[in-house]
């Protein structure tokens, strides 16, 4: 959960297990996209990145998109999603990131920032992939192939 931008998940615990957040006494399944008229706004982090990928699927159309990245560089990812809840936009943005939360001072205080020394550089790659006939993602291979979950 992004403390500075809690949105409509404001009643949820700071930390929760994907995909369910408990908000004001009821469970919110974050895999489900609410209608725009519900005016929902989410901003939260995935902090246990192991294999270096994140993905979104449209289960109705079978279209999936995902990002493959180096988990040593991008140790977490975040999802900002507004379904009419911010400026009436209907969009989801999934992105790997090097640290969290959004506020740098809080990130640094928690020891979650990446630091480059003067003159130091960092080079990495991020692979964006789109694939049809996928309703749930098991993984993303290094060549960008999105693997359908078995379940």
Description of each model-found segment:
Residues 1-69:
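Active-site/ligand-binding surface loops and adjacent short beta/alpha elements
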Residues 59-151:
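Active-site pocket scaffolds in enzymes
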């Amino acid at each position: 959960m992004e403390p500075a931008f809690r949105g409509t998940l404001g009643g949820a615990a700071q930390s929760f297990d994907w995909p369910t957040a408990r908000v004001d006494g009821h469970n919110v399944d974050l895999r489900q996209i609410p209608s725009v008229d519900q005016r929902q706004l989410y901003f939260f982090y995935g902090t246990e990145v192991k294999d270096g990928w994140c993905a979104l699927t449209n289960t109705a159309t079978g279209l999936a998109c995902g990002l493959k990245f180096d988990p040593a560089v991008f140790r977490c990812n975040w999802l900002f999603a507004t379904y009419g809840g911010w400026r009436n936009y209907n969009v989801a943005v999934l992105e790997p990131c090097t640290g969290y939360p959004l506020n740098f001072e809080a990130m640094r205080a928690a020891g979650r920032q990446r630091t480059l020394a003067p003159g130091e550089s960092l080079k990495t790659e991020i692979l964006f992939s789109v694939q049809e006939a996928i309703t749930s993602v098991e993984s993303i291979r290094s060549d960008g192939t999105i693997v359908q979950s078995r379940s």
